Amino acid sequence: MSWSFLTRLLEEIHNHSTFVGKIWLTVLIVFRIVLTAVGGESIYYDEQSKFVCNTEQPGCENVCYDAFAPLSHVRFWVFQIILVATPSVMYLGYAIHKIAKMEHGEADKKAARSKPYAMRWKQHRALEETEEDNEEDPMMYPEMELESDKENKEQSQPKPKHDGRRRIREDGLMKIYVLQLLARTVFEVGFLIGQYFLYGFQVHPFYVCSRLPCPHKIDCFISRPTEKTIFLLIMYGVTGLCLLLNIWEMLHLGFGTIRDSLNSKRRELEDPGAYNYPFTWNTPSAPPGYNIAVKPDQIQYTELSNAKIAYKQNKANTAQEQQYGSHEENLPADLEALQREIRMAQERLDLAVQAYSHQNNPHGPREKKAKVGSKAGSNKSTASSKSGDGKTSVWI
């Protein structure tokens, strides 16, 4: 018997199962397929040829063997393996079809994109080039990146390991997986009950037959009954082990789903304000470690040429000169009155200085007065010269 086709299918199921499902698959291949193909064929090859009855009545021996074994043990176990593996094979076909469809849809979406770019952050250099202060600008801005480069980076990063349950859920195969698991469990229970009613737990060394055309009750003898009994008990144990693995896998899926839901709720409670504000990729932000400072209006992020920068600088200088020229033309009309008030304040200050010096040095009033007079004259001449030039600066 060739098992290569079924074995290849079951190996493909190994890639779309949980770790409990992988254990079940190992038990199915090693203990069921190998034991049935190797041990069963060698043990039960002579079950009918060595079935001997103590009668010479034609046809009596065949009728008695049919009563002893309505279905051959090996054929029963082969039929059991095929039916138990059928739900898994159907699940595999559905999974391959759905995954291929999803990949095809993703490929179409990527091909339909007119601008296959992704966002990444880069330091803004346009403003720095115009300032010419040789200082780094901490502000960061998004830059477009090719989607292929992003995919290469994602492929280079190792994927987190898991037991297969999350992969099944992400692919949308959880319902089909649970359905095939239930069908597999039902088949296991059905074949376990059928094996008990057909063969029991022991292969007896002889069998009493009274069917027609046997003239009376006759005794029939079975070859190697002890060996066949041991093999029968082994197959009972393998069936029970597969049934326990199915139950364990269902519990694993149930508790794993509950644990994931509880963890997601706990993360939401721990970080309630994670999504309370709108997020946009176009908003500039500073990297960690930089102090936020108010900056002038940002120049639009473009690679400005030297000609454009020079043109903008000349335009700004011209506007500044025009602004300062207009300020000089709009001097106040009462400039002379302001100068008179300044001279009067200067005279009062001189008188106060003379009085103070007269009190402290009464012997030299003339010398002080002469010095003060010369100083006042020089100040007046300076003020008159400044007013004549039309400047607003006044020397005191």
Curated annotation (Swiss-Prot):
Location of this chain's protein in the cell: Cell membrane; Cell junction, Gap junction
Membrane topology (Extracellular): 46-75, 199-228
Database matches in InterPro entries: Connexin, Connexin45, Connexin_CCC, Connexin_CS, Connexin_N, Connexin_N_sf
Cytoplasmic side: 1-22, 96-175, 249-396
Domain of life: Eukaryota
Region (Disordered): 145-165, 353-396
Name of the protein this chain belongs to: Gap junction gamma-1 protein
Gene: GJC1
